[in-house]
């Protein structure tokens, strides 16, 4: 992991097109701004983890349901 120290008002770049700017520091909270192309998806980590979990659940196939489909197809 790369660790970068920045003060309020300073920024850093990720690649050529993503800028992360430190807007404000209040106690233990840091407010940041991110400038990125519209095709770049930006999520808070906890939201991204929920999306990944939901996607995994959506593609799970119940083995019993799958075997029923195979059985029904053979009886045609």
Swiss-Prot record:
The record ties this protein, via SUPFAM superfamilies, to:
CsrA-like (SSF117130)
Q: Which BP terms from GO are recorded?
A: bacterial-type flagellum organization; mRNA catabolic process; negative regulation of translational initiation; regulation of bacterial-type flagellum assembly; regulation of carbohydrate metabolic process
User: Which keywords describe this protein according to UniProt?
Assistant: Bacterial flagellum biogenesis, Cytoplasm, Repressor, RNA-binding, Translation regulation
| Compartments it resides in | Cytoplasm
- Where in this chain does the entry annotate a coiled-coil region? none
Please list the GO terms describing molecular function.
Answer: mRNA 5'-UTR binding
The reply to whether Transmembrane figures as a keyword in the UniProt entry is no
Q: Name one Pfam family in it.
A: CsrA
Q: Please tell me where this protein is predominantly located.
A: cytoplasm
Give the GO cellular component terms, alphabetically: cytosol
- NCBIfam families documented for this protein: csrA, PRK01712.1
Q: Which PANTHER family match?
A: CARBON STORAGE REGULATOR
Subunit organization: Homodimer; the beta-strands of each monomer intercalate to form a hydrophobic core, while the alpha-helices form wings that extend away from the core.
Family according to the record: Belongs to the CsrA/RsmA family.
State the function annotated in the UniProt record: A translational regulator that binds mRNA to regulate translation initiation and/or mRNA stability. Usually binds in the 5'-UTR at or near the Shine-Dalgarno sequence preventing ribosome-binding, thus repressing translation. Its main target seems to be the major flagellin gene, while its function is anatagonized by FliW.
Protein name from the UniProt record: Translational regulator CsrA
Q: Which organism is it from?
A: Pseudothermotoga lettingae (strain ATCC BAA-301 / DSM 14385 / NBRC 107922 / TMO)
């Amino acid at each position: 992991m790369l660790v970068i120290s920045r003060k309020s008002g300073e920024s850093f770049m990720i690649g050529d097109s993503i800028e992360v700017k430190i807007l404000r520091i209040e106690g233990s909270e840091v407010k940041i701004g991110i400038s990125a192309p519209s095709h770049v998806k930006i999520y808070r980590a906890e939201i991204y983890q929920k999306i990944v979990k939901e996607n995994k659940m959506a593609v799970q196939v119940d083995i019993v349901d799958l075997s029923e489909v195979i059985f029904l197809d053979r009886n045609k």
